[in-house]
Amino acid sequence: ENQTEEKTQYNLFDKGACVVSDNGVLKLINKDNQSLLSDELTIVSRVGDAVIVKQNGLYGMVNSKGQITVSPQYISLETMVPGKLYVYQVHGNNGMPAFGLVDGNGTIKTIPLYEEFRPYKTQDGILVKAYDSMGKQGLFNEEGEVVMQPLYQVTEPSKIKGLYNITDNLKKGVIGADYKVRVKPDYDDVRILVREDTFFVATSGLKSIVSKRVTQKIFETEGLILDIFKQSDGSICFVVEQDLFYGVCTSEGKWLIEPQYDEVLGIVAGKMCVRKG
């Protein structure tokens, strides 16, 4: 007796169409209570301003006007970025499942070359991690555009826009959005420090190397580099930890402050506040 009321309140689209449940069957109707789908299509779920449908065991997508945007042709169709991006599945050449990306308009964003996709949250939104059959990771944005090709075993955005942390054989490095390698993946750890200029601090064992580009090593020390700052004359200095003590060294390797302090409390205007004992 409340069926009409339920139909007008259940899963309403902005333009007046809505998904309703009629005896357990989902239907897409307009504001005049007319069905917008043919009987051959079964609604599986609503995604954004569309519905995922099934026909003869294959999945596709229909928008809120009843127009087929993704024809039913995929083994599965799953939401990756709601309302924007979806993962489709087909049979690969070897008979194994293969996955690609398609947007809500049915535009194929990537052919089915991948074994898996996962959303990856960042400060600027969602990136999509793509895993290929060679064990490499690529990155796509919310619209399905390529951010980074799958070149390394791990590829993740750094905190600096346009730079990406990479890992190969458990060794870390950095690559730019222009695909130029800033630090080869040869190190135990790599940090990016922005201090007027951008510095890359690579650590291997107890040795630290500072570079500005892949071929421009500006400092190397047996110790861990905590911070970098410039003196008033423009020369670059490094806060270094050696044997659990802290000091300051120039890029020429000269100690301005021998490593003798227990803690560095902060650096202000080129001056270091330290604690001893």
Language-model regions, residue ranges each:
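Residue-level detector of conserved, function-critical positions
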Residues: E1-G277
